[in-house]
């Protein structure tokens, strides 16, 4: 089971989240049949949203849109505060690696665009904020968003590693944030550690990468574990929801669908679940 660990430095001046999102991203890859670059890009977006959602309270829903003008198209993710996330990438078929190293490429295929966050508190007035993509690598773009839009200096590392068959091997990451009251001396110490820490891909290869991440972030500094939360890829789509969507088309459109197409098939963008509606089903909706 994937998990996210929340921690705070003993001084109360820094907080860090470390997470294992391997099963989340593996499920996304299986559902969307993504190739290497698309898998990594979608996975990084899901991890970023898991971190954002962990910062929210109540029954908020958080939508992250990474909107680029490159080959990927848009990447959309929706998360709740209970550890569930879902998402999709417009082009699941991008598969480009560096010839010399085999490194999966992401940034060049994201292109220029925006990192957008929409937080729905359930009050009917969602809060939207966005920042430009600075690299298209998603992790750096997310850190820039947190620092610029949420006004919280942040360090972020997130990645998805694939095996020789391009299946998800491990996925996860961390977020470190400076809290009010941190001294310049403390900030300098943490900055030095972050600059000197091993690459996120190296830390993810560790036997227990959550512990490896926390050790790299805190070093010898004492810290407290605040909570451990379960994470998963989970879609909340349902037949009833799509029935309601069909009803919004109006009776004439439903009648045409029944007469010309002899039914309807709707595929959920987020999880690829197919919902079949027969002529009899459509007739029932028309008479509803």
From Swiss-Prot:
Please provide the record's keywords in A-Z order.
Chaperone, Cytoplasm, Disulfide bond, Redox-active center, Zinc
Q: Which InterPro entries match?
A: Heat_shock_Hsp33 (IPR000397), Heat_shock_Hsp33_C (IPR016154), Heat_shock_Hsp33_N (IPR016153)
How would you describe the post-translational modification of this protein? Under oxidizing conditions two disulfide bonds are formed involving the reactive cysteines. Under reducing conditions zinc is bound to the reactive cysteines and the protein is inactive.
Give the disulfide map: 235-237, 268-271
List this protein's GO terms for biological process.
protein refolding
GO CC terms, sorted:
cytoplasm
Pfam families to which the protein is assigned, alphabetical? HSP33
Query: Can the keyword Cytoplasm be found in this entry's annotation?
Result: yes
**NCBIfam families documented for this protein:** PRK00114.1
Q: What does this protein do?
A: Redox regulated molecular chaperone. Protects both thermally unfolding and oxidatively damaged proteins from irreversible aggregation. Plays an important role in the bacterial defense system toward oxidative stress.
HAMAP family (alphabetical): HslO
The name on file for this protein is 33 kDa chaperonin
Organism, per UniProt? Streptococcus thermophilus (strain ATCC BAA-250 / LMG 18311)
Per the record, the gene is hslO
